[in-house]
Design a protein with these regions (language model features):
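Short glycine-aspartate micro-motif
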Residues: 3-5, 61, 71, 110-113
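DPxDG-like acidic metal-binding loop motif
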Residues: 59-90
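N-terminal beta-alpha supersecondary unit
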Residues: 1-64
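Phosphate-handling active-site elements
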Residues: 50-55, 84-95, 205-206
Length: 238
């Protein structure tokens, strides 16, 4: 079974193909180019270098969020289009679980964090039970200072993974029971995304078609929140 993975949930764009449990190719770019500029050329180049035709792909694994609202929409639209044309399923994987999968078979508890702005982070907690990655607590959103205080007093060893690590690195390094992994593990890799998707497919979980898969938004976008605040103030003035 060949799975094409697509992740555009952050500044980095990543695509990959796995066949069963073997990584065939992975292509990650972290530049200022927009995802709309680079995503399709990345997919086409990767498939070409791998001597693969898109018709050989059996399923699409797409990062459903949380993450950049614009990035998620671009990745999701691309996944839907490829799935529609080739009549193949789409497997949704959240970005926090895919990040945790970068720490394959880690013996510590894994805390995935992504920047949610306003000193907040999207959070996901995971651990490996044997070879299986297990969610400890549902994904959510939390103030970074509250989160770090909670982990500092947890009495457990944690690995903190994700792009938000860099934003709050000075604070994180002050806490002795938190470890920061190598830089390459702090971006969502499409290869890890595909590995999580393969497990989900085998278990019959989170499998959609091109019409039913949608981004996972933990909260409303800033534009939506500003609009609602404006409407609330207008109502109060009446």
């Amino acid at each position: 079974m060949k799975i094409l993975g697509i992740d555009t949930s952050s500044m980095a764009a990543s695509v990959a193909v796995i066949e069963d449990n073997k990584l065939i190719c992975e292509y990650t770019i972290n530049t200022k180019k927009t995802h709309s500029q680079k995503l399709m050329p990345m997919i086409e180049n990767m498939l070409g270098l791998s001597d693969l035709n898109v018709r050989e792909i059996d399923a699409i694994a797409v990062c459903e969020g949380p993450g950049s609202f614009t990035g998620l929409r671009i990745g999701m639209a691309t996944a839907k289009a490829i799935a529609h044309v080739n009549d193949i399923p789409v497997i949704g994987v959240n970005s926090l679980e895919a990040l945790a999968a970068n720490m394959n078979l880690c013996d510590k508890k894994i805390f995935s964090i992504l920047d949610a702005q306003r000193n907040q982070v999207y959070t996901g907690r995971y651990q490996y039970e044997g070879t299986k990655l297990v969610e400890i607590k549902e994904i959510g959103i939390q103030q970074i200072d509250e989160l770090l205080e909670e982990l500092a007093h947890s009495g457990e060893q944690w690995i903190l993974v994700g792009e938000a690590v860099y934003k709050y690195e000075d604070k994180i390094r002050e806490i002795s029971n938190i470890e920061i992994p190598a830089a390459s593990n702090n971006v969502t890799k499409a290869g890890s995304l595909c590995s999580v998707a393969k497990v989900k497919f085998d278990e019959g979980k989170d499998i959609f078609d091109c019409y039913t898969v949608n981004p996972l938004y933990i909260r409303k976008s800033q534009a939506e929140e500003q609009y609602e605040e404006k409407q609330r103030k207008l109502q109060e003035q009446k």
